[in-house]
UniProtKB/Swiss-Prot annotation:
Main location: cytoplasm
Source taxon at top rank: Bacteria
Designated name of the protein: Acetylglutamate kinase
EC code(s) of this entry: 2.7.2.8
Length: 244
């Protein structure tokens, strides 16, 4: 049973192509098991601005207050996820929306509360829930938030949430979908990228900006047993395959 985790951007509900849905349906006919994690950063920022909540980023991480958590839940669970579920339904996929509170799906801890507020990483996944849904031929669509053991909601980077899910589900493949076709060096997409090559390219400042945490997330997944991690803009193209 092949298991595939896909991370898509929060605005992907309006950008996913017919080829995306056709590929997912083809995989399901091959009895592949699929889980999708969605982002939503732009929607969160827009809603924060509307509600006069300061948007502050530290080293690329959104500082999140308790009010910020409430707004994040409104954006992800009230706007982004419903739009994505509807898009999948219209295109013939049987999906179900999940969040951290769905039978304790995602348990996490803060990474540095003094610096980042209620931002965390995931250290436990209720994989039994996912497997039960897979047995019913449902595709879980999961919001990137976690809950601590004491019940505090946390904001989680969507790439990190997808890699954690892939790790605990022992996924065979992970797709980190982005707005470019892969990791580009001098305008050309790298077909393969290893941790050693990544270090060399970083030293030469040839991988910079937002691609660095994405590649690091991919390497984390590869180190934890995911055989193929793709950084790409579509599931129909392998993009850059990251391995250890």
């Amino acid at each position: 049973m092949k298991k595939i985790v896909i991370k898509i951007g929060g605005n992907a509900a309006t950008q996913l192509t017919p080829a995306f849905f056709d590929t997912i349906k083809f995989w399901q006919k091959q009895h592949y098991k699929i889980a999708i994690v969605h982002g939503g950063g732009d929607t969160i920022s827009a809603l924060m601005s509307q509600l006069n909540e300061p948007v502050q980023k530290i080293n690329g991480i959104r500082f999140t207050t308790q009010n910020g958590i409430n707004i994040t839940k409104m954006a992800l669970l009230g706007q982004v996820q419903p739009a994505l579920l509807e898009s999948c339904r219209v295109n013939g996929l049987s999906v179900i929306g999940l969040n951290a509170a769905s039978d304790q799906l995602l348990t996490g801890h803060t990474i540095d509360q003094d610096t980042f507020g209620y931002v965390g990483n995931i250290h436990q996944v209720n994989t039994k829930l996912i497997h039960n849904l897979w047995e019913k031929n449902l595709i879980p669509i999961i919001a990137p938030m976690a809950i601590t053991n004491s019940g505090q909601w946390l904001n989680v980077n969507a790439d990190h949430a997808a890699t954690a899910l892939a790790k605990y589900l022992k996924a065979d493949e992970l797709y980190l979908l982005t707005d470019v076709s892969g990791v580009k060096i001098k305008g050309n997409v790298l077909q393969n990228l290893t941790s050693k090559t990544m270090e060399e390219l970083q030293k030469k400042q040839m991988i910079t900006g937002g691609m660095i945490p994405k590649v690091n997330s991919a390497l984390f997944a590869a180190r934890h047993g995911v055989r193929a991690v793709h950084i790409t803009n579509t599931v129909t193209h392998p993009g850059t395959i990251v391995t250890i």
